[in-house]
Amino acid sequence: MRQTAKRCGRWLAVLLVLGILIGCRWVFPRRDRIAGEAGTVTTAQSVTEAQGRNQCGGCSAAYLLRADGKDITGAEAYAEIPLKLPNGYLLPQGIRSYLRQEGYPAVMCRGTPDQLCARLREGLPVIALIQEGEALHYVAVVGCDSESLYLADSLCPPAEGYNRVVSREEFARLQQIGLPGFEEVYITAAPDR
């Protein structure tokens, strides 16, 4: 009887550890293994828009969707994104879930600016989480070259295509957001065709 209880206890411990590991895989971004590539890359582009309060994630997701031909505003996307904190901030997992609901196999990754630029070759903008002053901020990265990244930033004046250019070094600094496990986070989404 004791051996059976010990055996059941071991199996429960194994199942608990597996559950924790699977949960961590859902919560934390995976390290991107793509090789960074030199060269100029631009993706499908759209019109940037000014955000409402805490709507940068919605604006970035809407930019990506508009670049792929969908008609949506940042406010509409923000309203649909799950996993909002009580203050209105969006978790990266919420944006990933929303893009999956829209038919995109979105993946949350951690990687360098070079790796992010390699992901742009898939054809759609990449949503990056960066430090903007004292707050965290989502932007759509729409292109890059050997020196700079081109952003569609909802805090900058609206424009066609991109409205902010940052050096690779500056972008790498902006990616250091101060949350262990979430440094250098971005969300990729290639259309599910």
Which positions does each model-derived feature cover?
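...with weaker cross-activation on analogous glycine-rich loops/strands in unrelated enzymes
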Residues: 95-139
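Noncatalytic regulatory segments and standalone regulatory/sensor domains
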Residues: 11, 25-28, 85, 100, ...
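A mature extracytoplasmic/lumenal domain signature
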Residues: 60, 110-113, 132-134, 143-145, ...
